[in-house]
Amino acid sequence: MDGAELMRKVVAGFEKSDLRPLLDAMHDEIVWKTANKHKGLFRFDGHYKGKAVVVDVLAKLSVDYTFRSFVEKEILASEDVVWGLFDVSLAFDPKGLGRPAKDIELEMAIRWKLKDGKIIEHQAFFDTASLLIQQGAMAVPVPQP
């Protein structure tokens, strides 16, 4: 399976709340880079190394978010690097945080580096301010003149 097919398979699993395709595709030494670098904004931040650690991060992510759809806009693969651009729909249900559930819409880019046909590096890119606004955790900024 090439990198583009692998990404499509993993994303199809996410739409069904099935992490098995992702878990099967992860290299034991995976490095997982989140879109958030600041502590306290989300239950995830920074970089994580190793399959067991990443599984724990995914469990934390699943506490608040349920992915509903990943609509492919573009997937490009070149040798061992794969890029995907998606329109993502998800449910935000912040258990224990005292905030109401919300429907979220985001554009997300995902970059993978592969080793031996498995994901050795994952990085996601999305507008974290938009996510915080849609979650109700941040006010919509006043437009600048």
Model-based region annotation:
Residues 1-145:
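C-terminal and inter-domain tail/linker signature
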